[in-house]
Amino acid sequence: MLTDPDLPPEFERMSSKRPASPYGEADGEVAMVTSRQKMEDDGGDGLPAFHLPLHVGFKPHSEEFQAVSLLTQEGCDRRSPSYQHNTMELDCNKMPPFALHNAATSPIKAEELGRQSGESLANAMLGTPERRKGSLADVVDTLKQRKMEELIKSEPEETPSIEKLLSKDWKDKLLAMGSGNLGDVKGTPESLAEKERQLMAMINQLTSLREQLLAAHDEQKKLAASQIEKQRQQMELAKQQQEQIARQQQQLLQQQHKINLLQQQIQVQGQLPPLMIPVFPPDQRTLAAAAAAQQGFLIPPGFSYKPGCSDPYPVQLIPTTMAAAAAATPGLAPLQLQQLYAAQLAAMQVSPGAKLPGVPPSNLSNAVSPSSIHTDKSTSSPPPKTKDDVTQPLNLSAKPKGSDSKSPSSPTSPHIPRLSSALAHKPICSTSASTPLRVNSIDILSSITSPGYLNDHDAVTKAIQEARQMKEQLRREQQALDGKVVNSLGLNNCRTDKDKSSLESLTQQLTGKPNEDKFSHAMMDFNLSGDSDGSAGISESRIYRESRGRGSNEPHIKRPMNAFMVWAKDERRKILQAFPDMHNSNISKILGSRWKAMTNLEKQPYYEEQARLSKQHLEKYPDYKYKPRPKRTCLVDGKKLRIGEYKAIMRSRRQQAQIPISTAGVVYPGAIAMAGMPSPHLPSEHSSVSSSPEPGMPVIQSTYGIKEEEPHIKEEIHREDINGEMYDEYDEDDDPDVDYASDSENLSAEQAN
């Protein structure tokens, strides 16, 4: 028999009727609780009962169970009721509290379990000890398997698992619970209330989170809807733009087609030979109608004429292309014809100053005189004039000079024959202004004669605008050309006395009645090509400029630009682009004031450029020596005068010699000018001859050019000092847009420096 082992007091306090908690120790060690029960009827035969905790069955190893089974088999020699009772207690102690609870609620199940365990133990007691050992191990395994099945079955019937998740002290509460007294746990209502509060808080948080998610989802829906709407609007806008572009392209194609048709018509009309067509006043229309019809002339109906008036009526010349167009469209109303001639006048209204080459005097008389009209071919020309500014640099913009700024010694009046034509029955009182004409305007004048343009007022207006733009563009180009021609063909610029004498004799031959009108009839020569713009004059002018005052093999060296000129080069171009009609003197004043207003820091880059140009010029021309322009003097009535004194005397003489407007020629700004053909023997008019006066202000042509009042003027130029020019620094080939200032403007530029 086995003796009872010495047990510690904590193990003896616990009886078999109160099993240990299945969740006893946290480390999972096996705790054996033993107690001795002495039966009243078998006082000396008490059998010890070994109680195993619940978690022993869950151990993967079975050493503990084998030791317990060996001790049980050796101590039990016979079956007794106490043994069976202890076995029942062993079975019951191995069950968890939940299983005990289930057993208490279902006694039938508990009895079956007890019976089965008793039978298995009884069977294990029979036979040899080895067999009993094996049978006990089988019983233990069977019990473990059954208890596992019971635990799995009893899981749905357990209390809600939320208590284990939410309660932090569930271990203590379960340890405090008895095996059968589950309802005696203290603090259960409070803990449940706390758990309910926690659950409500979680529910509220989840509800608020759900609302936030729904709100965010709604915002996303709204944002997506707005984006879709924006995309739709953008697509509509793009579609509208594409439609508009398509319409514009279609309109452009239509306009291009119309332009092609008009060009074809112009080409057909342009094959007709252009002639010089005089336009007669209304009272002479009946007399010249037959001859004009024979010669291809066209007489406009829009001009009025008052007999006996002193106002000039220039003889106008219209190309035969316009006559052919008017003849091809006999149904034109007077208003349409007026529009047509208005377009022609707009094309011819060029700012006075630039002259386009015209026809020689012989061709002039032949062109103006039809076969059935008798004209008196009498020409008048002002006496020879001398140039006061012989070495004056080129002035590319027209310099406005009134009647008080002209002198007999300056070639401001060209040597162009004056023609006063009188008809057989009634003489024509006609004078002309000196306004230039454009060769390129023939295209516009021809294009507006087509039927499509004659019936469209907008087209005529557009043609007028184009004509004005073209005349402004070419006016500046012609001014440069005329300045060079004057320098090359002036009387005082002739290199030999032979040339001077030949020009003087030619002038005397052309001089007719000096007291007649000093204005010739306006003419247009449409037979001139673009190559006949005075290219010969340009070449002669350049040859003269390069060889003036030097040896034949000594080239002229330009001075390097200073800082002011470097800065003014671009500024002058900008001002001319903004104000094409601004005179050079005004531009120089503006540039001088601007340069003075600039700070040294702003001028620094231009001074650096000046230093670079000076260094480059010194390297290129190491032997260069600047020779300034000499002072010029004039001999007036045997007296040697400076230019300023001479101009003052001439101004006073002109004021004394002024005559009333009725007997003097009056030039209006809108009058049509005559264009003279520059020839090797006839100098063209300088660009500063007839500048555009103020609107509505007549420019009185003085009579200082009459032979009787012309003083003998001779300009003395020191040949030894003429080599070099003040502002002749850089070639016009390098910068065609650059302007060359005159003496007064150069002085202002030097003061600005």
From Swiss-Prot:
A biological process from GO: chondrocyte differentiation
Keyword Coiled coil tagged: yes
Region (Disordered): 1-27, 357-418, 679-753
Disulfide bonds: none
PROSITE patterns cross-referenced by the UniProt entry: HMG_BOX_2
InterPro entries associated with the record: HMG_box_dom, HMG_box_dom_sf, SOX/SOX-like_TF
Residue ranges with Acidic residues bias: 726-742
DNA-binding region: 557-625
Biased composition range(s): Polar residues: 362-373
UniProtKB keywords: Coiled coil, Differentiation, DNA-binding, Nucleus, Transcription, Transcription regulation
Gene3D superfamilies referenced in this protein's UniProt entry, alphabetically: High mobility group box domain
Location in or out of the cell: Nucleus
Signal peptide: none
Pfam families assigned: HMG_box
Compositionally skewed regions (Low complexity) per UniProt: 397-413, 685-699
Biased composition (Basic and acidic residues): 706-722
Main location as per UniProt: nucleus
The keyword Coiled coil appears for this protein: yes
The protein's name in its UniProt record: Transcription factor Sox-5
Organism of derivation: Xenopus tropicalis (Western clawed frog)
Gene: sox5
